[in-house]
Structures are given as structure tokens and as C-alpha cells.
Amino acid sequence: MMKPETSAMEQTSSEILEKAIAFGNNGINLIGRMFIPVNASKHNRVPAAVLCHGYGSDQAIFEDSARELAAEGIATLTFDFRGHGSSEGELDGSIVDDVMDAWDYLHDQPEVDHKRMGLIGHSMGAFSAILAAGKLRKAKVLVALACPGEINNPIAVNPRHIFHPALKWGITMIFKIVQRTHKLEVRVNWKKFIAFWPKMKPSRALADLDNCSKLFVFCLGDPAAPYNKFLYSYGMASEPKRVMVYTGNHDTPLEEGMLRSQWQKWTVGALHGRHPY
């Protein structure tokens, strides 16, 4: 177990304190950042949320949202997944552990109200956040932005086929083409990463999250995470739940505009105990 590290707290606005952090319980040092409302303390605990970026991205993609949520009284934590940004290691089959490590770090902060914590993720980060929520069974709020659907193809999910050379090569090439096309900098253990996806079932996790308010956000022009591919998982999700489908592309939920404003407003209401539906 690594000893968590933090930098000195700095006040970046009249409303928010920020600090760089490092944490990790699984032999991988993860780099992140916390955004804390200035009025938060152990005597005035506030809601909190972990924000999880997508494949090939890093924590910077969520910093605007993290600051805006902190300005609304919610402590936030962003971080780089293993194999991404400044964090150590390679992207493999343990990304859910990264989310849970981030959750534990945030949970341990004296300013945080443990009963009002949430997970927010985009793309791969949304997929991982759902799986982590299923393991933790403690999240009050779950926000999944542009989440890929699970793999239900009987050939792909059969353990005998996962490492079939042709299947493994095909899936690997798809990720590599995306990585090169968009100039993504990711350190990947392909064997472990490719084996991870078919075995993970967000629908099972979502079915058991009865006490968690869930929001799913999709864009009609998103070929990476088409909303119709997530319908099975959404159908399996327990209430309370809501879906937003807007025009846009894979990254539109992260960009300044109406959609980002809407899901952030929903999150603020849910974590502050105001009915968001």
C-alpha cells in the first residue's frame, strides 16, 4: 500500500481550494487533483464526487467540471488512470481498482460527507465508474457520460475465445487505430486490457444500485458510444434512473455548453438531496 501524498492547498478562487494529490493501494502511483469548497471542513462536511476520464485522455478533461461542481459546494477529485497522463503503470484489466482507490482517498478526507458521494465518468471512465459503483454499493449518485455498451456477443464472451489470435488481433487493432488517429498517448498491456472488456457486465452492477440516483448521457452523433448499444444495460438498471440524449459527438458532454450544464445541474441537485428527476 502506497502512502498518499498531497501538495500544499492553494486557493485558486474565492470559492475553491485546490491541491495536487498522489495515491494508490495496488502498487501503482496515481496522480490526481482535489477541488474543495472553501467553506468545507470537518465541522461542515460537503458532498463529493470522483470524476473518471476516458481512454487516451487525462484528468485535465474534467477540470472545468470539477471546478464548477466545487463552486456549487461539492468536493471533487480528478485523476489520471494507470497508463495515462502522469500516473504510473500500464492500462490493463485493473482500471476499476483505480476508481475504487480514488473513492477511498476522497472518502478519507475530513471535509467529505460519506453519505453523499458520487461517481462521474466519461467513456471508459463511465464504464469503470459503473463497475466500481457495483462493487462499492455506497455511491449516492452515478453519472455515466457516453458509456460504451457491454459486449454480449457469445463468441467474444466465451473464455475459450477471448485469446483466439484473430479476435484478439481485431480488437487490439481497433484500439490502436483510434489511438493513432487521435494521437492518444496511452501505455497499454494489450493482453490484459483486451481480456478485461468482454468479462465486465455493467448491467449486473446497475441492477443492484437501488439507492443510487443514476444519470446516463448520450449524443446522437457518437459512433464510439451509440445510445442504442446501451439500451440493454439501461433497461437492467434499477430505479431511480434518467437518460439524456442530445445532439453532438463523443466529447460533447465534456465541452462547455447546454449539455454539460444540464448534467452538472442534475448532479448538484442529486448530491445536495434535491430531487433531480
Task: Place the predicted regions along the sequence by residue.
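N-terminal cap/lid segment of alpha/beta-hydrolase-fold proteins
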Residues: 2-44
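Alpha/beta-hydrolase fold nucleophile elbow
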Residues: 111-123
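Catalytic nucleophile-loop/oxyanion-hole region of alpha/beta-hydrolase
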Residues: 82-114
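Conserved alpha/beta-hydrolase
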Residues: 66-86
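Short beta-strand element of the alpha/beta-hydrolase
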Residues: 44-54
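Hydrolase active-site cap/lid region
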Residues: 134-191, 213
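The serine-hydrolase catalytic nucleophile loop
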Residues: 54-67, 81, 228
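Serine-hydrolase catalytic core
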Residues: 183-272
